[in-house]
């Protein structure tokens, strides 16, 4: 948690002005079938608190698609500690777990504490508990930390509520209509990383969450840059003739893959970030682009038109023949591999429709996850439970969320421009 606090604090030091036109999660499908849970409003033991911690925890669990927190007006009681919970009152509503908590002012901030209480199996027992001493600006972070711990205790899956998303917003006019922004996963605490008069594309997070690689056209042609979030430093890593695009950091943090067309067709290259040495991975007259890494940091999945239409292939970065991965649909592109390497998500086109699909890399089974319009650029949460992507809505582009089982759906509408190229951060 200390490393995460250090990274997040560096963001706050550099970008203290939070934008007003933030994206916010609006759930559109799936929460009604999720597991009911009680998240009692946290008790304040010393005056008003600037953030309602219980509401943030409830929103996190609801946004996961796996829980459906009941409305406080339906709660049989509103206890502040495990000792005050009456298990039978909750199980009568079909609720087998309740979260209670307190927020106590301190000399320089707040003490936030929570308890997760079992109301059925071992009625009244505390399944998880913790407390966090934070300043005012870290109250939301404390709430997300509690959510992560509760989520993992109840599901066995690591929570991802302290992660961030990066995305590009094209605003209407102005000197710098293109902005690369970063926000908490739920759209709060949004800030601008970089403004540009020319298009920005394809942000990619470094393995430790401290840097973003992206494509810029500020020099008059495409270039790949890496920006350090703590100090804003920008380093150009590729600006070859013709196309430079699709950057992707390796999971071990040592390499950056990207696509170049300096020799004619698009091909994949990998840069060793320690030495700066660039090696070519694919070669030929077909177009090979949109690399994404397998967990071993030695293998890439990518889009290629070597069979005529775009499909997903994989290849080792040290040589070998490519292997085709996708066979369903007229074309498949823009894939991302899950952090455990068990599945990929991609943009799949069939019969004129363009949706986000998931392919099991063991069985080969494919599931279409979305029903939105002209879906693009999917990015998977680090725990593999959710996908963020952009789609067309009306005349603009918005961000959408879908669970990797396809049951839960939500959108993150923005009010000040078109939003594209979402990228979900690693754990922070």
Swiss-Prot record:
A GO cellular-component term linked to this record: periplasmic space
Alphabetical keyword list: Cell cycle, Cell division, Periplasm, Signal
Cell compartments where the protein resides: Periplasm
Disulfide bonds: none
Keyword Cell division: yes
Matches recorded under Pfam families: PD40, TolB_N
Signal peptide residue numbers: 1-21
Domain of life: Bacteria
Major location category of this protein: periplasm
Biological process according to GO: cell division; protein import
Keyword Iron-sulfur in record: no
UniProt-listed InterPro entries: 6-blade_b-propeller_TolB-like, PD40, Tol-Pal_TolB, TolB_N
Quaternary context: The Tol-Pal system is composed of five core proteins: the inner membrane proteins TolA, TolQ and TolR, the periplasmic protein TolB and the outer membrane protein Pal. They form a network linking the inner and outer membranes and the peptidoglycan layer.
Record-stated family: Belongs to the TolB family.
Function: Part of the Tol-Pal system, which plays a role in outer membrane invagination during cell division and is important for maintaining outer membrane integrity. TolB occupies a key intermediary position in the Tol-Pal system because it communicates directly with both membrane-embedded components, Pal in the outer membrane and TolA in the inner membrane.
Protein name: Tol-Pal system protein TolB
Provenance organism: Dickeya dadantii (strain 3937)
Record lineage: Bacteria, Pseudomonadati, Pseudomonadota, Gammaproteobacteria, Enterobacterales
């Amino acid at each position: 948690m200390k490393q995460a606090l250090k990274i997040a604090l560096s963001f706050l030091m550099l970008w203290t002005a939070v934008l007003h036109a933030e994206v916010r999660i609006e759930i559109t499908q799936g929460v009604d079938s999720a597991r009911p849970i009680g998240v009692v409003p946290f008790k304040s033991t010393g005056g008003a608190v600037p953030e309602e911690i219980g509401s943030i925890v409830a929103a996190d669990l609801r946004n996961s698609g796996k829980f459906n927190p009941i409305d406080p007006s339906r709660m049989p009681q509103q206890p502040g500690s495990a000792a005050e919970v009456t298990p039978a009152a909750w199980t009568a509503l079909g609720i087998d777990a309740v979260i209670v908590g307190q927020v106590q002012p301190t000399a320089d901030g707040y003490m936030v504490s929570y308890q997760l209480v079992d109301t059925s199996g071992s009625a009244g027992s505390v399944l998880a508990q913790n407390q966090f001493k934070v300043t005012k600006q870290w109250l939301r972070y404390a709430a997300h930390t509690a959510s992560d711990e509760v989520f993992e205790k109840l599901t066995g899956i690591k929570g991802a509520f302290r992660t961030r998303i990066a995305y590009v917003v094209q605003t209407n006019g102005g000197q710098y209509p293109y902005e690369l922004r970063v926000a908490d996963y739920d759209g709060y605490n949004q800030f601008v990383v970089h403004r540009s008069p020319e298009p920005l594309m394809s942000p990619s997070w470094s393995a430790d969450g401290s840097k973003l690689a992206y494509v810029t056209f500020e020099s008059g042609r495409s270039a790949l840059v890496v920006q350090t979030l703590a100090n804003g430093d920008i380093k150009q890593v590729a600006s070859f003739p013709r196309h430079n695009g699709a950057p992707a950091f390796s999971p071990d943090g040592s390499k950056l893959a990207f696509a170049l067309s300096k020799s004619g067709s698009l091909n994949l290259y990998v840069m060793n970030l320690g030495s700066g040495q660039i090696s070519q991975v694919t070669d030929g007259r077909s177009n090979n682009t949109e690399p994404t890494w397998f967990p071993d940091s030695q293998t890439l999945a990518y889009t290629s038109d070597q069979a005529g239409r775009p499909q997903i292939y994989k290849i080792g970065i040290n040589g070998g023949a490519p292997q085709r991965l996708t066979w369903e649909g007229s074309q498949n592109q823009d894939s991302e591999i899950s952090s455990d390497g068990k599945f990929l998500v991609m943009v799949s086109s069939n019969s004129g429709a363009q949706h986000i699909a998931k392919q099991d890399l063991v069985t080969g089974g494919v599931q279409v996850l979305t029903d939105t319009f002209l879906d693009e650029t999917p990015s998977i949460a680090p725990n593999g439970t959710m996908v963020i992507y952009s789609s067309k809505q009306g005349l603009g582009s918005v961000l959408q969320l879908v669970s990797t089982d396809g049951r839960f759906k939500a959108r993150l509408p923005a009010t000040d421009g078109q939003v594209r190229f979402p990228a979900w951060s690693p754990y922070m």
